[in-house]
Amino acid sequence: MKNVTDSFVSLGHWPFAGSFGFNTDILATNLINLSVVLGVLIFFGKGVLSDLLDNRKQRIWSTIRNSDELREVAIEQLEKARARLRKVEREADEFRVNGYSEIEREKWNLINATYENLERLENYKNETIHFEQQRAINQVRQRVFQQALQGALGTLNSRSNSELHLRTISANIGMLGAMKEITD
């Protein structure tokens, strides 16, 4: 008991306008005060600490749930993206195959068109050569005919007499008359 009264007496000796601080001497502090302070801290701190821990626990659980939901959404999106990628790869393969076959088809079409053009040019060349040959043959024939006609006329003129002329004219008139009768 003496300690209790000594502590009250010592309170009177403390300066009121002095500094505030912790008394680190455990023997000089009042155990009752310490137990009251600790009891109050435990009583009120327990609820606050429990609320803090519950709030933290709820935040952790909600974060875990959110991350699980986000993971599920990410997995779904990944599967959709993989499906789209497979589809695009299939389409790309089809385009590639179709493109190669289209290129091959166009190549053969071009080769065939080139052969057809060459064949047409060859035919045109042959027709042109044939035409030029026919023209040359016709020119030669005309010259030969003209020369033969001139030779025949020259021979006729040199050997002709008036009686021969009269017979030729009569024969020609007879032929013209016969032709006229046929046409009428």
From Swiss-Prot:
GO terms for cellular component: chloroplast thylakoid membrane; proton-transporting ATP synthase complex. The keyword Transcription does not apply. It is a single-pass membrane protein. It is found in: Plastid, Chloroplast thylakoid membrane. The chain crosses the membrane at residues 26-48. GO terms for molecular function: proton-transporting ATP synthase activity, rotational mechanism. Keywords: ATP synthesis, CF(0), Chloroplast, Hydrogen ion transport, Ion transport, Membrane, Plastid, Thylakoid, Transmembrane, Transmembrane helix, Transport. F-type ATPases have 2 components, F(1) - the catalytic core - and F(0) - the membrane proton channel. F(1) has five subunits: alpha(3), beta(3), gamma(1), delta(1), epsilon(1). F(0) has four main subunits: a(1), b(1), b'(1) and c(10-14). The alpha and beta chains form an alternating ring which encloses part of the gamma chain. F(1) is attached to F(0) by a central stalk formed by the gamma and epsilon chains, while a peripheral stalk is formed by the delta, b and b' chains. Belongs to the ATPase B chain family. In plastids the F-type ATPase is also known as CF(1)CF(0). F(1)F(0) ATP synthase produces ATP from ADP in the presence of a proton or sodium gradient. F-type ATPases consist of two structural domains, F(1) containing the extramembraneous catalytic core and F(0) containing the membrane proton channel, linked together by a central stalk and a peripheral stalk. During catalysis, ATP synthesis in the catalytic domain of F(1) is coupled via a rotary mechanism of the central stalk subunits to proton translocation. Component of the F(0) channel, it forms part of the peripheral stalk, linking F(1) to F(0). PANTHER family: ATP SYNTHASE SUBUNIT B, CHLOROPLASTIC. HAMAP family: ATP_synth_b_bprime. This is ATP synthase subunit b, chloroplastic. It comes from Calycanthus floridus var. glaucus (Eastern sweetshrub).
